[in-house]
Regions:
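Short glycine-rich phosphate-binding loop at a beta-alpha junction
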Residues: 58-67
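Short, glycine/charge-rich flexible loops or terminal/linker lids adjacent to PRPP-binding catalytic cores
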Residues: 73-110, 118-120, 174
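Active-site-facing substrate-recognition patch
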Residues: 1-57, 187-190
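Residue-level preference for short coil/turn positions at secondary-structure junctions
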Residues: 59, 104-106, 152, 168
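PRPP-dependent phosphoribosyltransferase catalytic core
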Residues: 2-8, 126-190
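Hydrophobic/aromatic beta-strand patches that form the interior of the parallel beta-sheet core
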Residues: 64, 86, 110, 137-140, ...
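A generic structural signal for well-ordered alpha-helical segments
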Residues: 55, 77-78, 129, 149
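A contiguous pocket-lining binding segment that forms or flanks enzyme active sites
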Residues: 103-140
């Protein structure tokens, strides 16, 4: 599976090299531009199929993801599992379910996201699920690029595991070398 996932990301031109500011605030020489993959329904269907197949017997009732890439992944995994999908948005420094999204007490939720680096988005969605009384039964991501294994207290499934270095801005060798910093998805790139 990992070879197929890597081939999909390469075919879509989604593995970028340079000096990038990640959403987490960390810097990295590699950026996984998941939207270059997610713009292709056949790639999205295939990748989300790996996740759906992995959790098919887990009695998932709802698939939840964070905005923005997580919305697409949650929808497609939920479609393949035949369940609902919802997403959590940032509000007041935390993620919340708005737009009329609810969970029943004890409802079994699979949390999905596109790329795992620090795990903060996933943790925030898990907290939002808990606040509504849902039970997170697993976590899944397309790409796990975290330097260290992340523990969420539930099983973690990734379509691709790859270690990509990240640096705090103060310790970034790319900054020290004077390589310009790119902010993917920022207004400056549009």
């Amino acid at each position: 599976m990992s070879e197929e996932v890597m081939a999909i990301f390469k075919a879509a031109g989604a593995i970028l090299e340079g000096h990038f500011l990640l959403t987490s605030g960390l810097h990295s020489p590699v950026y996984w531009e998941k939207f270059r993959v997610l713009q292709h329904p056949h790639y999205t269907e295939r990748l989300c199929g790996f996740i759906a197949d992995h959790y098919r017997r887990s009695e998932v009732q709802v698939v939840a993801g964070p905005t923005t890439g997580g919305i697409i992944i949650a929808f497609e995994v939920a479609r393949q599992l035949g369940v609902r999908s919802i997403f959590a948005e940032k509000e007041g420094g935390k993620r919340v379910f708005r737009r009329g999204f609810t969970l029943e007490s004890g409802e079994r939720v699979l949390v999905v996201d596109d790329v795992l680096t620090t795990g903060s988005s996933i943790s925030e969605v898990m907290e939002a699920v808990a606040r509504l009384g849902g039970i997170v039964i697993g976590v899944a991501v397309l790409v796990n690029r975290a330097e260290q294994d992340k523990q969420f207290g539930v099983p973690l499934f990734n379509c691709l595991r790859t270690v990509t270095p990240t640096y705090t801005p103060s310790d970034c060798p790319l900054c020290a070398a004077g390589i310009p910093l790119t902010r993917p998805g920022s207004e400056a790139e549009r």
